[in-house]
A protein has these predicted regions:
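Alpha-helical transmembrane segments and their immediate juxtamembrane cytosolic regions
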Residues: 1-362
């Protein structure tokens, strides 16, 4: 029981992140542009939390998967986790494309360009696959080797962002270019977001290694607070100092637009908050939200964007709501999405019985 409780705050983080993602998508898509005023402190606070949601979500995804993978040393257990991870990665990729597939276009014999856009599900699926590959290459043989390479991937992906952020990859097949470049319409790309997932994998191994130490949580919270501060407020000056020391011009660009490392600082602060609240976020409903983020995400996509049939709220209320309407609407929207997810999960046994009867051997 004690071992399981140490994961409660991770599920709580995932619950918070998916709720923030849902309300962010709702308000961003339906709020009238005339109310998007950066001179308004309330709007700026909302904008800040919207900005940290994706980094937190990607980090938590890498953290929980790696934690469960390395939790036991038994070979059969790990093989089971790896198989489950591969299936989930494939499921995420498939769902990512299905949610963007336009049925009306298919009836016309067309596949619209937006059907190939890469979104958050694609990126998490690829991130899980990369973590699995990293496990087979290094993790099977070296615990700390895996951790070191994982955090190095994060640092490299973030530092070299100025070199790939504006790539168009026009010579690539459009299907593949969407994974690297936003030039043709993708919402997310593998890089730099992979860096947050591998950083989560790194944190998972630290958690597993040191969680049994005396005063682990107070020390971990302090480290996250200090680390977050350094990343948010000191990392730009650090990159400038390194650039001047070794004369590496790239670091000037990193320091000028240092959002990736600064968001990583935000991630550490969120971790610190939830570790501090670990004994207060153990309600079964909170944990259930964190454990069912995929179904919640899919349901919200269908309700808000209409997904494959293009008949969602976005079609009727696109950028037309007042702040009061957007805020109250987002509360209702999040509540309905979560409740429908719970209904879907609770009907699993019933659905399994129906399918088993349909496909039962006569």
């Amino acid at each position: 029981v004690i071992e399981q409780k140490r994961l409660f705050f991770i599920d709580a983080i995932r619950a918070w992140a998916i709720i923030m993602m849902l309300q962010g998508h709702f308000i961003d898509g339906l709020l009238d542009p005339i109310y998007r005023n950066t001179d308004n402190n309330i709007y700026n606070i909302w904008l800040y939390f919207r900005g940290i949601t994706a980094p937190v979500f990607f980090t938590a995804s890498g953290l929980i998967f790696t934690y469960l993978l390395f939790k036991e040393t038994d070979k059969s257990y790990r093989n089971k986790r790896l198989k489950k991870g591969l299936i989930r990665a494939g499921q995420l990729l498939l769902l990512g494309y299905l949610l963007r597939l336009n049925i009306n276009g298919l009836f016309k014999g067309e596949i619209y360009p937006s059907s190939y856009y890469v979104d958050v599900l694609h990126c998490i699926g690829i991130a899980l696959f990369c973590i699995i590959v990293l496990y087979y290459l290094i993790g099977k043989w070296s615990y700390w080797g895996f951790a070191l390479v994982a955090v190095l991937i994060s640092v490299i992906v973030f530092i070299f962002e100025p070199l790939y952020i504006n790539l168009t990859l026009d010579s690539w097949p459009i299907f593949l270019s969407h994974y690297i470049s936003k030039a043709h319409g993708s919402v997310f790309t593998i890089i730099p977001w992979l860096g947050y997932s591998t950083f989560g994998a790194f944190l998972a191994l630290l958690l597993l290694k040191f969680k049994s130490f005396h005063k682990f949580y107070p020390v971990a919270i302090l480290i996250c607070i200090l680390g977050g501060y350094l990343l948010k407020y000191e990392s730009s000056d650090f990159f400038i100092w390194v650039r001047d020391t070794i004369e590496w011009p790239l670091l000037k660009n990193v320091a000028a637009k240092n959002y990736l490392f600064m968001r990583l600082g935000d991630v550490l602060w969120v971790l610190a908050i939830f570790m501090g609240l670990r004994n207060a976020v153990t309600h079964p409903r909170i944990l259930a939200i964190g454990q069912n983020t995929l179904s919640i995400y899919v349901i919200h996509s269908v309700l808000l964007y209409g997904s494959s049939y293009n008949f969602g709220l976005y079609r009727f209320f696109k950028q037309s709501l007042t702040p009061t309407e957007a805020i109250s609407g987002s509360i209702v929207f999040v509540t309905i999405s979560v409740l429908l997810s719970f209904l879907y999960v609770h009907s699993q046994n019933w659905r399994s019985q129906i399918f088993s009867r349909i496909f039962a051997k006569k």
